[in-house]
């Protein structure tokens, strides 16, 4: 290809030289102006030509021929800056119009009517339905008039109240009115079908509230109030193991609050004690007794009060007949000698007590016992909450008797 280029260039130059020779021969007797013009053409022949006789290798000649006629590439930075540059006339963003606040003179409350298109609706829905969001914000969802009143009575802070019908709001107007003035509770009216979708209950009560979880300060205040009324917590910690049913866990917490126990420990693998069904099963017990949830067996020893760590007794309530045969068990009525603090481990009806619980029992040596409730022939077990009620009040009776003997 390079030879062809040089060949064509040489042929063109030869033709131009021949033309000049003809001009010289014909102009020997011609006028002076024509001869000068021919000489100027000869002098500038290669200077004005588009062809250049430049040293060039084959690779460079092929590259020039391949990319001849193409547009030069635009650097990436210039393209990016051009594409990412702001438009000359950006469209202004229209901020959503906030819903008007409705002042109800009859209830003496202020609320906002939410629609499905309101951005706040999706935010509230995420908070209600997402356990991860609730755990991060340490919030709980409370449904129903009685449970909301119980939470307010125990000093919990109500962030949001949702209602669908005005007559339902009227049932709690006094307590909610105080909360709105003191803590700035926000009240929203939503359609009944939306509230039914958000609720985890089959029959929604029409009232749903978002509360902050009980704080240590609030529990200490409730404890001081119980002591003032003559109700001192007993040195008993109930440890829930493999409790998978929310209603059963709620009933267990309710019994512990009724005794009352020092605290309730919910081990890893149990259901959520702050789930809506567990709260309804607890009937407000979660607001009155300290609860430590999602505790591993390695962390269980840290829940024992430091002042009673040297004299802590551990009891396992075993309902499985086969496990009772493999371990030395005693009748719960034959328990003798309780410690400065006592751990009662109770398992679920389906899975029973785990092997981790027995390994923890072996750590305390002679201060650990496996107990059972004798039942009639043909009856395999009791409901876990019913069994716990029998055991706790028997331990309470023995603690009272033990204290009276020391006096």
Swiss-Prot record:
InterPro entries: Alpha/beta_knot_MTases, MRM3-like_sub_bind, Ribosomal_eL30-like_sf, rRNA_Methyltransferase, SpoU_MeTrfase, SpoU_subst-bd, tRNA_m1G_MTases_N. S-adenosyl-L-methionine binds at residues 347, 373, 382. It is found in: Mitochondrion. GO terms for molecular function: RNA binding; rRNA (guanosine-2'-O-)-methyltransferase activity; rRNA (uridine-2'-O-)-methyltransferase activity. Signal peptide: none annotated. Its EC number is 2.1.1.-. One of its GO terms (biological process) is rRNA processing. The keyword Nucleotide-binding does not apply. Keywords: Methyltransferase, Mitochondrion, rRNA processing, S-adenosyl-L-methionine, Transferase, Transit peptide. One of its GO terms (cellular component) is mitochondrial matrix. Gene3D superfamilies: 3.30.1330.30, 3.40.1280.10. It catalyses: a uridine in rRNA + S-adenosyl-L-methionine = a 2'-O-methyluridine in rRNA + S-adenosyl-L-homocysteine + H(+). Transmembrane segments: none annotated. It comes from the Eukaryota. Residues 1-25 form a transit peptide. Belongs to the class IV-like SAM-binding methyltransferase superfamily. RNA methyltransferase TrmH family. S-adenosyl-L-methionine-dependent 2'-O-ribose methyltransferase that catalyzes the formation of 2'-O-methylguanosine at position 1580 (Gm1580) in the mitochondrial large subunit ribosomal RNA (mtLSU rRNA), a conserved modification in the peptidyl transferase domain of the mtLSU rRNA. Also required for formation of 2'-O-methyluridine at position 1579 (Um1579) mediated by MRM2. This is rRNA methyltransferase 3, mitochondrial. The lineage of its organism: Eukaryota, Metazoa, Ecdysozoa, Arthropoda, Hexapoda.
């Amino acid at each position: 290809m390079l030879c062809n280029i040089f060949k064509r260039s040489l042929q063109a130059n030869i033709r131009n030289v021949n033309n000049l020779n003809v001009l010289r021969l014909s102009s020997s007797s011609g006028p002076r102006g024509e001869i000068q013009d021919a000489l100027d053409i000869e002098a500038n022949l290669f200077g004005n030509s588009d062809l250049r006789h430049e040293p060039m290798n084959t690779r460079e000649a092929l590259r020039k021929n391949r990319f001849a006629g193409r547009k030069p590439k635009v650097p990436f930075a210039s393209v990016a800056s051009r594409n990412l540059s702001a438009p000359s006339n950006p469209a202004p963003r229209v901020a959503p119009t906030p819903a008007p606040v409705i002042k109800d003179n009859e209830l003496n409350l202020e609320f906002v009517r939410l629609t499905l298109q309101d951005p706040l609706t999706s935010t509230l829905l995420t908070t209600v339905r997402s356990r991860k969001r609730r755990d991060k914000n340490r919030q709980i969802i409370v449904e129903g008039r009685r449970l909301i009143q119980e939470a307010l009575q125990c000093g919990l802070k109500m962030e949001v109240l949702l209602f669908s019908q005005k007559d339902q709001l009227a049932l709690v107007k006094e307590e909610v009115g105080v909360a709105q003035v003191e803590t700035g509770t926000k009240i929203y009216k939503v359609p009944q079908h939306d509230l039914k979708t958000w609720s985890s209950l089959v029959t929604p009560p029409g009232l749903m509230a978002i509360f902050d979880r009980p704080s240590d300060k609030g529990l200490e205040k409730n404890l001081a109030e119980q002591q003032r009324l003559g109700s001192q917590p007993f040195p008993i910690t109930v440890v829930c193991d493999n409790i998978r049913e929310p209603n059963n866990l709620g009933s267990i917490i309710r019994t512990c609050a009724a005794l009352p126990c020092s605290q309730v420990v919910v081990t890893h693998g149990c259901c959520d004690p702050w789930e809506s069904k567990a709260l309804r099963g607890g009937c407000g017990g979660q607001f009155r007794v300290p609860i430590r949830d999602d505790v591993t067996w390695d962390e269980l020893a840290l829940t024992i009060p430091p002042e009673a760590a040297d004299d802590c007794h551990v009891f396992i309530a075993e309902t499985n007949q086969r496990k009772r045969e493999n371990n030395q068990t005693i009748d719960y009525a034959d328990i003798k000698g309780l410690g400065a603090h006592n751990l009662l481990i109770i398992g679920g009806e389906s899975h029973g007590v785990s092997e981790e619980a027995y390994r923890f029992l072996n750590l305390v040596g002679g201060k650990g016992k496996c107990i059972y409730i004798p039942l009639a022939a043909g009856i395999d077990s009791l409901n876990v909450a019913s069994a716990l009620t029998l055991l706790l009040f028997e331990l309470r009776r023995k603690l009272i008797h033990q204290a009276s003997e020391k006096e």
